[in-house]
């Protein structure tokens, strides 16, 4: 049985996404979210929930949100699972 180690809520800024080409912005945002969580949770094994994907791609490829609120849970085996935090 894998136990939950810790749980954090992060507000991830996505303003650097605006530097990438317009048609790549949502792809870049997903990569940035994964990299942010890997850095702050100190784990390379990051799984993103479908709710995060839906929120980023909600307005298409060219207009991702400026920031996103995420709940990340790190388990004893080092895996990080992230989902969209409820307001």
Curated annotation (Swiss-Prot):
Signal sequence, renumbered to the chain: none
Keywords linked to the UniProt accession: Ribonucleoprotein, Ribosomal protein
SUPFAM superfamilies in UniProt: Ribosomal protein L31e
Cell division in keyword set: no
Gene name of the record: rpl31e
Gene Ontology molecular function terms on file: structural constituent of ribosome
InterPro entries documented for this protein: Ribosomal_eL31, Ribosomal_eL31_CS, Ribosomal_eL31_dom_sf
A Pfam family: Ribosomal_L31e
CDD domains: Ribosomal_L31e
Classification via NCBIfam families: PRK01192.1-1
Organism phylogeny: Archaea, Methanobacteriati, Methanobacteriota, Stenosarchaea group, Methanomicrobia
One GO biological process term: cytoplasmic translation
A GO-annotated cellular component: cytosolic large ribosomal subunit
Top-level taxon of the source organism: Archaea
Family membership noted in the UniProt record: Belongs to the eukaryotic ribosomal protein eL31 family.
Protein name: Large ribosomal subunit protein eL31
PROSITE patterns on file: RIBOSOMAL_L31E
